[in-house]
Structure formats: C-alpha cells, structure tokens
Amino acid sequence: MSDPRERIPPGNSGEETIGKAFEWLNRTVEEINRAAVNHLPRELIFQVWRRSWEYWHDEMGMSESYTKYRYLCLIQKALFVHCKKGCRCLGEEHGAGGWRTGPPPPPPPGLA
C-alpha cells in the first residue's frame, strides 16, 4: 500500500518557505503603507503602527513578524471600510490628521 500523505514538492523546504514568508510580509507592509497614505490620514497610520508595537510586541511579547501581521490586518480592514464607504480620494493625500498633540510617532516601513 502506498503512503497517502502529501509530499513536499521539490525546492519547497521549510527553511525556504519561511524565508519567503518573512520577505513577503515585509514587502507587503511597505506596499500597503504606500497605498494607505492616499486614503487614510498619516497620523492614523502612524498611530496604528505604534500601538501595534506597544500592544502586540511589548505588552503581549509576540514576535516582530506577528506584530507586523496584526498591523497589516488592521490597515487592510481600515482600507476596506474606507473603500466600502465610497472612496473619493482620487489619489490625493490626506493631511496629518491634526488630532494629537506632541511629536509624531516614528513612521512605519515604506513611509520613512
């Protein structure tokens, strides 16, 4: 009787796949940030980035990749809701938001 379990295709070892996943995550975070500034206030993007690091990484002790993944999910959801409500941005950038005092938080990747 033959083994019914699926076999790993050649060239797809765990190490290669994991490395590609991290590259994909970093690249996707940068790309979504470049797109998000055309639809969301920069201040909002920066605050979500900062708060994601404070909560998921610092408070919960999660890895950098998990923190970036959670941030990515939040920004994707924000863009989805924005577009669902009827985006009329047409590529114009929004201002800083103007609703927070003090120095701005450090920018997320792709917006530095």
Curated annotation (Swiss-Prot):
Coiled coil: none annotated. Interacts with the P6 region of unprocessed GAG. Interacts with host VPRBP/DCAF1, leading to change substrate specificity of the CUL4A-DDB1 E3 ligase complex. The lineage of its organism: Viruses, Riboviria, Pararnavirae, Artverviricota, Revtraviricetes. Its main location: virion. Keywords: Host nucleus, Host-virus interaction, Inhibition of host innate immune response by virus, Viral immunoevasion, Virion. One of its GO terms (cellular component) is host cell nucleus. Pfam families: VPR (PF00522). Belongs to the lentivirus VPX protein family. It is found in: Virion; Host nucleus. One of its GO terms (biological process) is symbiont-mediated suppression of host innate immune response. A motif (Nuclear localization signal) lies at residues 65-72. Residues 93-112 are annotated as: Disordered. This is Protein Vpx. Residues 102-112 have a biased composition (Pro residues). Plays a role in nuclear translocation of the viral pre-integration complex (PIC), thus is required for the virus to infect non-dividing cells. Targets specific host proteins for degradation by the 26S proteasome. Acts by associating with the cellular CUL4A-DDB1 E3 ligase complex through direct interaction with host VPRPB/DCAF-1. This change in the E3 ligase substrate specificity results in the degradation of host SAMHD1. In turn, SAMHD1 depletion allows viral replication in host myeloid cells by preventing SAMHD1-mediated hydrolysis of intracellular dNTPs necessary for reverse transcription. InterPro entries: Lentiviral_Vpx_assoc_factor, RetroV_VpR/X.
